[in-house]
């Protein structure tokens, strides 16, 4: 048996301002840091001992990872940071206020961009040139993604980096983002394209899965429930 714990980063500045974030590299708020400490204590109380931690290339997730590991007194754990665990790329919506986008594009269209599994947001003209992505082939860097595309981006990392550890009986910790974790939950629980709309992970919330030797889910649950509004459910 092995356990997987997945954690969504604490509240970011963009969550606070109600703006689309995606691959924008925004900081945690004071509340977000507090949420990270709280979920770290929740995980410690549950008694998990991890072999590896996985996170994205975005500092809101990286810092949450470090705070959680500090609370666990496991700062020496091996950590892998991967662009494949980045948040879903919101394309040209990045940086826009969510209320403003409803006014410009309409409530129905914005809801479709946010919640549909296959809907694409308006794309950026160019993909990211940030130095952190220098090892990622230009053709692999998105200019905007549907949740389906973000899931396909995530899958190779899950299969190649996380699953082998679980199959070896080693507990794994993933600290990532709202949409990334929804995609992972969809894969683990085999949720339909339609039903994934109702799945949420709050800022500073941890979910756990206990797997059998064949990666069958034996047990699952939520360790901590953050407090957030509907506007904070992504990014």
UniProtKB/Swiss-Prot annotation:
<feature type="binding site">
    <location>
        <begin position="114"/>
        <end position="115"/>
    </location>
    <ligand>
        <name>substrate</name>
    </ligand>
</feature>
<dbReference type="GO" id="GO:0004619">
    <property type="term" value="F:phosphoglycerate mutase activity"/>
</dbReference>
<feature type="binding site">
    <location>
        <begin position="8"/>
        <end position="15"/>
    </location>
    <ligand>
        <name>substrate</name>
    </ligand>
</feature>
<feature type="binding site">
    <location>
        <begin position="21"/>
        <end position="22"/>
    </location>
    <ligand>
        <name>substrate</name>
    </ligand>
</feature>
<feature type="binding site">
    <location>
        <position position="60"/>
    </location>
    <ligand>
        <name>substrate</name>
    </ligand>
</feature>
<feature type="site" description="Transition state stabilizer">
    <location>
        <position position="177"/>
    </location>
</feature>
<comment type="similarity">
    <text>Belongs to the phosphoglycerate mutase family. BPG-dependent PGAM subfamily.</text>
</comment>
<comment type="pathway">
    <text>Carbohydrate degradation; glycolysis; pyruvate from D-glyceraldehyde 3-phosphate: step 3/5.</text>
</comment>
<keyword id="KW-0312">Gluconeogenesis</keyword>
<dbReference type="GO" id="GO:0006096">
    <property type="term" value="P:glycolytic process"/>
</dbReference>
<dbReference type="InterPro" id="IPR013078">
    <property type="entry name" value="His_Pase_superF_clade-1"/>
</dbReference>
<feature type="binding site">
    <location>
        <begin position="87"/>
        <end position="90"/>
    </location>
    <ligand>
        <name>substrate</name>
    </ligand>
</feature>
<feature type="active site" description="Tele-phosphohistidine intermediate">
    <location>
        <position position="9"/>
    </location>
</feature>
<feature type="binding site">
    <location>
        <position position="98"/>
    </location>
    <ligand>
        <name>substrate</name>
    </ligand>
</feature>
<comment type="function">
    <text>Catalyzes the interconversion of 2-phosphoglycerate and 3-phosphoglycerate.</text>
</comment>
<dbReference type="InterPro" id="IPR029033">
    <property type="entry name" value="His_PPase_superfam"/>
</dbReference>
<keyword id="KW-0324">Glycolysis</keyword>
<dbReference type="InterPro" id="IPR001345">
    <property type="entry name" value="PG/BPGM_mutase_AS"/>
</dbReference>
<feature type="active site" description="Proton donor/acceptor">
    <location>
        <position position="87"/>
    </location>
</feature>
<keyword id="KW-0413">Isomerase</keyword>
<dbReference type="InterPro" id="IPR005952">
    <property type="entry name" value="Phosphogly_mut1"/>
</dbReference>
<dbReference type="Pfam" id="PF00300">
    <property type="entry name" value="His_Phos_1"/>
</dbReference>
<protein>
    <recommendedName>
        <fullName>2,3-bisphosphoglycerate-dependent phosphoglycerate mutase 1</fullName>
        <ecNumber>5.4.2.11</ecNumber>
    </recommendedName>
</protein>
<dbReference type="GO" id="GO:0006094">
    <property type="term" value="P:gluconeogenesis"/>
</dbReference>
């Amino acid at each position: 048996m092995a356990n997987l714990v997945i954690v969504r980063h604490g509240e970011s500045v963009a969550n606070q301002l109600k703006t689309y974030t995606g691959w924008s590299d925004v900081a945690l708020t004071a509340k977000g840091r507090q949420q990270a400490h709280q979920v770290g204590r929740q995980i410690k109380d549950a008694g998990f001992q991890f072999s590896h931690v996985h996170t994205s290339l975005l500092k809101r997730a990286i810092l949450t990872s470090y705070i959680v590991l500090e609370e666990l007194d496991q700062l020496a754990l091996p950590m892998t940071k991967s662009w494949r665990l980045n948040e879903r790329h919101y394309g040209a919506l990045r940086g826009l206020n969510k209320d403003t986008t409803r006014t410009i594009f309409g409530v129905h269209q914005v809801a479709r961009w946010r919640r549909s599994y296959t809907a694409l947001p308006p794309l950026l003209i160019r993909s990211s040139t940030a130095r952190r992505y220098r090892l990622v082939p230009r053709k692999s860097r998105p200019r905007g993604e549907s949740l389906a595309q973000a899931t396909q981006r995530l899958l190779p990392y899950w299969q190649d980096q996380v699953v082998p550890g679980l199959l070896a009986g080693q507990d794994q910790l993933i600290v990532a983002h709202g949409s990334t974790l929804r995609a992972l939950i969809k894969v683990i629980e085999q949720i339909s394209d339609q039903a994934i709309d109702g799945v949420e992970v709050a800022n500073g919330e941890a979910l756990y899965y206990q797997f059998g030797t064949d990666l069958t889910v034996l047990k699952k649950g939520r360790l901590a429930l953050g407090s957030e509004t509907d506007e904070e459910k992504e990014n």
